[in-house]
A protein has these predicted regions:
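Acidic/glycine-rich beta-solenoid
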Residues: 1-203
Length: 203
C-alpha cells in the first residue's frame, strides 16, 4: 500500500506467484477508479514469454496491451512484439553470431533502423554501425595510447547525416583508472580539440 503524496488516497498492490515462486500477476488500484493488472507467462527456463498489461478506469473502456518475447535454442532474445487493440507490431529483432555475440538489432522491422555490431578476437566490442549512428572503439589500435587490458584507448562516432566525425582519446593511471578524456574531431581526433574534454582530478 502507498499513500498519494498530498492526499489521503491510497494505492493498493497485490502480488500473485506461481508454483516456482515467480511473480505471475500484479494487481494495483489506480486513481481513476480502476485497476492496472500485469500478468506474466514464463518459458521453461524462467524467461518472460508474454507480459500482458490491462488498464481499467471508471467509465472508460478497458485497454490491454501485450509484449511477446521469442528466444533461440540458447535462450538469447530473438524478437520483441507488441500488441495493442488487436494490432501486432515488431519492436525489435536480434541476430547473433556463432559465438553467441549480438550481431545485429533491427527496430520496428525496418532495415533502415538496423544496427550491426563488430568485435575483435577477444570479443571486445569494436564497432556499432547503422544508418542513424556509427561508433568505433579502439583498444590497442587507433589514435590513443594503446591499451591491452580491455580499456578503450579512443573512440569515434558520427550521428545521423552529420559529416563530422567526433571522438575522444582516453588516458589511464597505473591502476587502469580513467584520468583524461580528450575531445577531438575528424578521424584523427586532432581537430577542434579540448572543446568537451574531461579530467579526473583525484581518486
Amino acid at each position: 500500500m502507498a499513500t498519494v503524496l498530498g492526499s489521503s488516497n491510497k494505492i493498493y498492490t497485490a502480488y500473485y506467484y506461481d508454483i516456482k515462486g515467480r511473480v505471475a500477476k500484479t494487481v494495483q488500484s489506480n486513481l481513476l477508479g480502476g485497476y492496472d493488472v500485469t500478468a506474466t507467462i514464463y518459458t521453461f527456463t524462467d524467461k518472460p514469454a508474454t507480459v500482458t498489461h490491462t488498464h481499467t478506469a471508471s467509465g472508460k473502456p478497458t485497454r490491454t496491451e501485450m509484449y511477446t518475447y521469442s528466444y533461440n535454442h540458447a535462450d538469447r532474445l530473438l524478437k520483441v512484439e507488441h500488441t495493442l487493440g488487436g494490432t501486432k507490431i515488431t519492436l525489435a529483432d536480434y541476430a547473433y553470431d556463432n559465438l553467441g555475440r549480438l550481431q545485429s538489432k533491427s527496430l520496428h522491422g525496418s532495415a533502415t533502423n538496423k544496427l550491426t555490431y563488430a568485435y575483435n578476437v577477444r570479443s571486445w566490442l569494436t564497432g556499432i554501425s547503422g544508418s542513424k549512428f556509427t561508433q568505433n572503439l579502439y583498444y590497442n589500435t587507433g589514435n590513443g595510447t594503446a591499451c591491452y587490458t580491455g580499456n578503450i584507448s579512443s573512440m569515434t562516432w558520427k550521428a545521423g547525416n552529420e559529416s563530422t566525425i567526433r571522438g575522444y582519446k582516453f588516458t589511464y593511471d597505473g591502476l587502469s583508472r580513467l584520468m583524461n578524456a580528450t575531445y577531438g574531431e575528424t578521424a584523427g581526433i586532432n581537430t577542434n580539440t579540448n572543446r568537451f574534454s574531461e579530467n579526473v582530478t583525484a581518486y
